[in-house]
């Protein structure tokens, strides 16, 4: 099996697990946060800079890379690792979420999804087989099965149909996925309905994927509902398979996910808000582009030792962002990724020492106060 997880420690008071995820491109510690490199790049960053922030496993996007530059071109370049000069592990999502986000631009049938490109309106058709062809050409260490992501809120009837189709599509993905140096993960759906989540999990667990994504959360539902789904789902998940909560990356959700037994996370949030001039700090979010920081010569976060906080002030970074200088959003991105990776490092240490609940309380008390 190209990808497997070895659980090294279970936290005494929670479901949290400390593990090592082995992939064809090296071993990474879990719980892990994956920076998102939608178009084969973590926006504004070089691979070396991503590594300096603590990033070890990155995510890239099947839908976007299929449209531009095309999966055949990436294959010709020697695969995604060579193309983007990243020597660590990569995960590609299946494009399911992106396609379903297109709303009126897409039509779902049993065979697959017809959609119009958000770039030029051209027509395309994704089937599970087509998505497997694309992901195998990209050659990431982990490929996600093609799923149907039900929106929130949605009728139970719709959630059932999406769940059933996700199961059938997972079977089709598994049938045609042949690449031996790539692991195919299944994705559990079911909306916010506990019985449907359980059903989806059981159907996918029966297919014995080497790992499982939990999809269809963080799509607008209240956080409490997401936590309820995890509380109910995690006890039935196999101990020896990685569990990946898709699209989740705010500091509070990362901690709450780990407490419930999640191993892997990804999210555009840290990099996206950085480009809007907002950063995470130990005292909550700070919008550094705001006028109140024009004469503030302190670092963005006084407790942070990232490159940006060691060298630049809020006033300077605000100036860069206000004048549309690219360095500004590079510095906020470096900081946010460093902040999240540092948080994950602290979480792993807290699991090691069986004090995750104390860490959660201490961190959130100060973070939420901001």
UniProtKB/Swiss-Prot annotation:
Gene Ontology biological process terms, A to Z: queuosine biosynthetic process; tRNA wobble guanine modification; tRNA-guanine transglycosylation
Listed GO CC annotations: cytosol
Gene3D superfamilies for the chain: Queuine tRNA-ribosyltransferase-like
Entry keywords, A to Z: Glycosyltransferase, Metal-binding, Queuosine biosynthesis, Transferase, tRNA processing, Zinc
Quaternary assembly: Homodimer. Within each dimer, one monomer is responsible for RNA recognition and catalysis, while the other monomer binds to the replacement base PreQ1.
PANTHER family: QUEUINE TRNA-RIBOSYLTRANSFERASE
Protein name listed in UniProt: Queuine tRNA-ribosyltransferase
Species whose genome carries this gene: Desulforamulus reducens (strain ATCC BAA-1160 / DSM 100696 / MI-1) (Desulfotomaculum reducens)
């Amino acid at each position: 099996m190209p990808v497997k997880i070895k659980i090294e420690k279970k936290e005494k008071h929670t479901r949290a697990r400390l593990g090592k995820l082995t992939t064809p491109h090296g071993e990474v510690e879990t719980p892990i946060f994956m920076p998102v490199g939608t178009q084969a790049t973590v926006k504004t960053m070089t691979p070396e800079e991503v590594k300096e922030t603590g990033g070890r496993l990155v995510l890239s996007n099947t839908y976007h890379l299929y449209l531009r530059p095309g999966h055949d071109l990436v294959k010709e370049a020697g695969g995604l690792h060579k193309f983007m000069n990243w020597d660590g592990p990569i995960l590609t999502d299946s494009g399911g979420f992106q396609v379903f986000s297109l709303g009126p631009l897409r039509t779902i049938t049993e065979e697959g999804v017809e959609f119009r490109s958000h770039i030029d309106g051209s027509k395309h058709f994704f089937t599970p087989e087509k998505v497997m062809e694309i992901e195998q050409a990209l050659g990431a260490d982990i490929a996600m099965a093609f799923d149907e992501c039900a929106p929130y809120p949605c009728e139970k009837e719709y959630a059932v149909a999406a769940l059933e189709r996700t199961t059938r599509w997972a079977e089709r993905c598994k049938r045609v996925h042949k690449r031996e140096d790539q692991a195919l993960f299944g994705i559990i759906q079911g909306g916010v309905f506990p019985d449907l989540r359980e059903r989806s999990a059981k159907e996918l667990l029966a297919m014995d994927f080497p790992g499982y994504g939990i999809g269809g959360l963080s799509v607008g539902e209240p956080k409490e509902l997401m936590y309820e789904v995890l509380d109910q789902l995690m006890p039935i998940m196999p101990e020896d398979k990685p569990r990946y909560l898709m699209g989740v990356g705010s500091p509070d959700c990362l901690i709450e996910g780990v407490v419930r037994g999640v191993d892997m996370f990804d999210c555009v949030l840290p990099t996206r808000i950085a480009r809007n001039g907002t950063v995470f700090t130990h005292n909550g979010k700070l919008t550094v582009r705001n006028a109140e920081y024009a004469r503030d010569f302190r670092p963005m976060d006084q407790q942070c030792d990232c490159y940006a906080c060691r060298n630049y002030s809020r006033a300077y970074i605000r100036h860069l962002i206000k004048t549309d200088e690219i360095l500004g959003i590079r510095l906020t991105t470096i900081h946010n990724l460093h902040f999240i990776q540092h948080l994950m490092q602290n979480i792993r240490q807290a699991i090691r020492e069986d004090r995750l609940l104390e860490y959660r309380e201490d961190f959130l008390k100060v973070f939420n106060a901001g």
